[in-house]
């Protein structure tokens, strides 16, 4: 359960670690409110993707009742125009655009401009991949870089040479040209 997982994470990482819960669109409003109460003792930093991305008013309505936990999301929004609508609706406390899905670095910078205008923090979805990492280090994004090496059955770790690795919970992009990686052409 989410409660058991949060308890285990808190016991392993201690009182100061940020614990985030990604519900992947599986909660509704009442479940989010109930889980907020059940998880309160674990000081959850954010609930990610609690509702479907088009339910902006529902997300906005959850922000205050679940405080201090943040309502985050945005990986399923694919344009800066969509993030402008999220801002107008006051739907999310924290934005998580996915640079590979929202139009790349240029679109990501447009999204950051909108976020800055509304004082909304940004932590890119899959920010630990080279594209997200470069946006993080070249902007005022939060210094949080989600990295899931070797999961989902995808050969991502073999696709690129020079991909940064996590060391002691930190990740640094390398300083090679471009994004700092080279395509493994043997996989083509």
Q: What name fits each language-model region?
A:
Residues 1-66:
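Metal-dependent enolase-superfamily TIM-barrel catalytic cores that perform enediolate-based chemistry
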Residues 37, 43, 54-170, 174-177:
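Shared catalytic-loop signature of beta/alpha-barrel
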Residues 186-188:
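Short, intrinsically disordered, charge-balanced linker/junction segments flanking boundaries
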């Amino acid at each position: 359960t989410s409660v058991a997982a949060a308890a285990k994470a808190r016991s392993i990482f201690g009182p100061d670690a940020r614990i985030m819960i990604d519900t992947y669109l599986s909660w509704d409003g009442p479940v989010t409110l109930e889980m907020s109460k059940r998880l309160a003792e674990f000081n959850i930093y954010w609930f990610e993707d609690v509702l479907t991305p088009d339910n902006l008013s529902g997300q906005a309505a959850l922000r205050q009742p679940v405080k201090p936990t943040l309502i985050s999301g945005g990986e399923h929004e694919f344009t800066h125009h969509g993030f402008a609508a999220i801002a107008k609706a006051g739907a999310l406390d924290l934005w998580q655009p996915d640079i590979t899905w929202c139009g790349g670095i240029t679109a990501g910078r447009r999204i950051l401009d909108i976020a800055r205008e509304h004082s909304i923090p940004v932590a890119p979805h899959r920010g630990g991949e080279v594209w997200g990492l470069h946006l993080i280090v070249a902007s005022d994004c939060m210094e949080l870089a989600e990295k899931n090496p070797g999961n989902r059955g995808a050969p991502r770790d073999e696709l690129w040479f020079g991909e940064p690795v996590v060391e002691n919970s930190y990740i640094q992009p390398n300083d090679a040209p471009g994004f700092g990686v080279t395509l493994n052409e043997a996989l083509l």
